[in-house]
Each structure stands twice: as structure tokens, then as C-alpha cells.
Amino acid sequence: MNHRISKEALEVWHNEPSVVASILPLYMNGIHLSRYGNYQEGPQLIDYFETKEEAVRHYEYLKQVYQSISAKETYSPYIFFWESAFLTRSDIVLKMAYITWMLHDSALRDDLCAYLPTLETYMRAGYIGIVLNPPTSQLQEEYVLQSLGDRSVDVRDEAYKVLSDMTLSPEQNLKVEELLRFKYSEMRINAINLLMKQPKEQLADSIRRLLT
């Protein structure tokens, strides 16, 4: 019920970020992007939208809101002078991520990769470990590979798990080699483990480059 009402409200008020701030907490509020518990199966489209087209339209609404606000907006006073409302880009991207999760649309997931750096790190780690596991395009592969060097340990760990199940190209392994210059010991160990999966000739080339 909450989602249905908030969905209808977003149809009308998506051009008003201050109103979206009050809509968003109820919008798709039954979804949890968590690596733990029983949340990895993913939401069903039919539980939240009438059609795929409607879901994509709402994704575009959310993207418009994202582009119209700063990292965090504060609306105060809000309705009453003692109240305030907040809207962050991370909040918006999380709802966009839910839509890409339920649609299984590779092109939409490609599009979201440009916005994922704004997402709060715990949720970003969950998205990589659940929705981008495995990646379904080269762009998604590159995003996961880039995340192997993220500041967040959670994000790095999930990226490593995804990459461990992939066969990396020589070009991708070159990018993994670059991570060995960073000081984080866990990041370096992950990079070495990935490089050790290469065929013997490519591994020898990696060792030669790293020693020169």
C-alpha cells in the first residue's frame, strides 16, 4: 500500500525534489539490498510496477531528481517550522538500483554504473555482490574491476569475489597489476591471487613487468 501511494505521488511530483524527499522513504520500502540474510533472491517486478515500461519510466524520474540536487539537500522548515526533510543522491541511486535489480536489464545496469559511486558503501558492496554477480557486459566488468581498488573494504571484498569467478583478459590483468602499488595489504593479496590464475606465459609476463 505504501509503495502504491508513493509510486502514484512520484508520477505527479517527480519534478519537485522537496516533495520527493517525503515520498522516497515509502517508495519500494520493502526491498533490502543486503549480502546477508534471505534478501539475495531479488524483488519481483509485478510486486512494484504494472509493466517493465512503467519501471523504466520511474528509473528516469529518479535520474532526473538525482541530476537536479546536490549530494545532500535539506528542506527546513518542512510542513511545520520545527520539521526538516532530507534528500541525498545516495537515497536516489539506491531506488534506481532496486529497479535495475528487478528488471534484469543489462543496458540499464550499464547506465547505473555511472551513478554507483554516489551510493553509500555498504549498499554499493551489496549491489556488486548480488546484482553484478556475474557482470553481463564489458562496462559492468570494468566497474567491478575498478571497485577492486575502492577505499571501502566491503566494496573491495565483493569485487574480489566476483572477479575470482571470472577469466580476466590480458588487458584486465594489467589493471590488476596496477593495484600492487597501493599500501593496503589485503588489496595487494587479492591482486596477487587474481594474477596467479593467469596462464603460465601471461603470469611470467606479469612477473617480468613487476620486477622491472
Task: Identify the meaning behind each predicted range.
Residues 1, 11, 29, 44-47, ...:
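Structural detector for internal amphipathic alpha-helices that build alpha-solenoid repeat scaffolds
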Residues 1-66:
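Non-catalytic protein-protein interaction scaffold segments in large eukaryotic complex-forming proteins
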Residues 6-10, 56-63, 71-81, 105-116, ...:
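Amphipathic alpha-helical scaffolding segments comprising HEAT/armadillo-like alpha-solenoid repeats
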